[in-house]
């Protein structure tokens, strides 16, 4: 297991950073709190960089890269709070690629943007495939899919779907009449499909409630393992974006601690500040190691990917929550005002920790699998 980046991965990361640097994404994130149209359209940039085809095989016009590479791109997006729809895009393309779908060439070229409509895989606490609740904590079952000739008819709703607004194709995880998970590709504008944009705490996130009423789509030929992989890939992507945001929180806070003086000393010389920022660094390095492990496991040790992605999501979510609060603390009064970037990262932390089951769900998954492994070893 070698987590050192290859020359190609370093180039990919630097290219992503360079592409994103052309846009004032953090300034736009602040303006978008009042006017959503202030966010720049980053989709053309993503297409130019080849991101829609990151996980698509080369034979279909994609880059044929792996999860590790995709997480590097996601981390750079998180670094500058860029509103690039990777969480919805890449799990959807992974499912389409596994199915060898006819739309792959259009997806890889960026002519067709898919979005993943997720369902949570079964666990010890919840044995079925479930979706986010509209409110409260009780999760409901995934949409129902009924066979209708060569197509599937969908009924049901999925709430708080990342990157669904503006998508052309929805890749939906549903359950069939036998209770088995299926993937259905359906046009976002098809009859019986409603994509309702919802207000979000973090203006850089695009969310929608998606409803199906007798909507017809085509079944994708994939098994449950592919659908589980897509769920955990989404978790790993959220973790990577969070890690990028933690890095920015740390960099900005350290720079301020060096230049802000009080009582004749830089505030960074005081133990209260030093210890808090050291804890941010510790959490950052721990989370990045787990992110790299998840990226490696998806290709080289797929049976460990669920645990690795859950661990990365759990660690990175807690790290960003801590780092965003530390950023406000270090900056004092100015850190709590809209003139500063700190509240933007705090908002990102609070919304990210709640998406797709939330950080707590990932933590529960780690606990379940760790305890199960310990019990098996003791048996």
Predicted segments with their positions:
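Alpha-helical interface subdomain recognition
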Residues: 1-80, 152, 232-379
């Amino acid at each position: 297991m070698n987590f050192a980046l290859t020359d190609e991965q370093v180039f990919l990361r630097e290219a992503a950073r360079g592409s994103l640097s052309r846009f004032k994404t953090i300034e736009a994130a602040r303006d978008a709190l009042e006017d959503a149209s202030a966010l720049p359209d980053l989709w053309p940039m993503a297409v130019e960089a080849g991101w829609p085809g990151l996980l698509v095989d080369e034979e279909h016009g994609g880059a044929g890269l792996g999860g590790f590479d995709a997480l590097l791109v996601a981390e750079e997006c998180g670094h500058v709070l860029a509103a690039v729809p990777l969480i919805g895009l890449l799990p959807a393309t992974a499912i389409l690629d596994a199915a060898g779908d006819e739309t792959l060439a259009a997806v890889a070229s960026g002519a067709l943007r898919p979005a993943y409509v997720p369902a949570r895989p079964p666990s010890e606490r919840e044995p079925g495939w479930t979706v986010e609740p509209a409110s409260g904590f009780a999760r409901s079952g995934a949409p129902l899919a009924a066979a209708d000739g060569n197509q599937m008819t969908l009924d049901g709703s999925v709430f708080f779907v990342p990157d669904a607004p503006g998508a052309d194709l929805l890749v939906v995880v549903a359950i069939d009449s036998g209770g088995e998970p299926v993937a259905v590709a359906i046009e976002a504008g098809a009859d019986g499909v409603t994509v309702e944009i919802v207000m979000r705490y973090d203006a850089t996130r695009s969310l929608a409630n998606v409803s199906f009423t007798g909507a017809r789509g085509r079944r994708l030929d994939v098994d449950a393992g592919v659908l589980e992989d897509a769920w955990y890939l989404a978790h790993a992507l959220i973790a990577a974006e969070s890690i990028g945001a933690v890095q920015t929180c740390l960099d900005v806070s350290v720079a301020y601690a060096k230049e802000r003086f009080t009582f004749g000393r830089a505030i960074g010389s005081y133990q209260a500040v030093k210890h808090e920022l050291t804890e941010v660094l510790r959490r950052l390095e721990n989370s990045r190691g787990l992110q790299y492990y998840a990226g490696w496991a998806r290709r080289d040790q797929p049976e460990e990917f669920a645990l690795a992605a859950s661990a990365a999501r759990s660690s990175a979510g807690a790290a960003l929550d801590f780092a965003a609060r530390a950023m406000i603390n270090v900056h004092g009064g100015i850190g709590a005002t809209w003139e500063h970037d700190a509240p933007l990262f705090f908002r990102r932390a609070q919304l990210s920790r709640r998406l797709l089951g939330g950080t707590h769900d990932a933590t529960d998954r780690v606990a379940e699998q760790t305890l199960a492994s310990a019990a098996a070893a003791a048996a």
